[in-house]
């Protein structure tokens, strides 16, 4: 916030990226949302019942992954820890498209084999900043965007061919 106050996070779960709702928790969440909407809109308009998803997993079609190189040289992919530049490794998030997760894992391995320098937010040194993947459920198309700190991407054709060999879709 501009006035110096910290913004409180609504999500109090210990690891919001990896947390998955049980069916019962999901139903309670829908009831809570219904109650909140009825409170907010009572007197203005009738509130139709909130319709939940039949399968509330693997629906997110946009996946973004950050990378970090550990001291032992291993490259991990994941999300930034809240309020830091520290990357927390995540695999198999229950709301993100499974194809995108597999591509991120393979890209992480390709970065290691191509000896790519992972960008360090604190030092400002490195090449690979993050990867964004969009999937289209209707067409099956997948778009991979590699965000770099420089317009020069060494061995970009070889890297793209290696990725296409692993994921021709």
Which residues does each PLM region occupy?
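Accessory RNA-recognition modules of RNA-modification enzymes
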Residues: 1-169
């Amino acid at each position: 916030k501009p006035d110096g106050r910290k913004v409180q996070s609504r999500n109090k779960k210990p690891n919001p990226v990896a947390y998955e709702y049980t069916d019962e928790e999901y139903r309670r969440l829908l009831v809570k949302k219904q109650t909140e909407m009825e409170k907010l809109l009572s007197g203005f308009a009738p509130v139709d019942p909130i319709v939940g998803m039949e399968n509330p997993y693997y629906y997110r079609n946009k996946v973004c992954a950050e990378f970090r190189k550990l001291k032992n040289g291993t490259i991990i992919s994941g999300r930034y820890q809240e309020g830091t530049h520290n990357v927390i490794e995540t695999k198999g998030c229950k709301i993100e498209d499974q194809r995108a997760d597999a591509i991120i894992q393979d890209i992480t391995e390709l970065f290691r084999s191509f000896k790519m320098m992972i960008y360090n937010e604190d030092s400002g040194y490195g090449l690979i900043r993050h990867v964004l993947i969009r999937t289209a459920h209707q067409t099956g198309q997948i778009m991979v965007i590699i965000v770099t700190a420089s317009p020069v991407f060494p061995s970009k054709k070889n890297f793209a061919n290696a990725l296409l060999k692993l994921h021709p879709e």
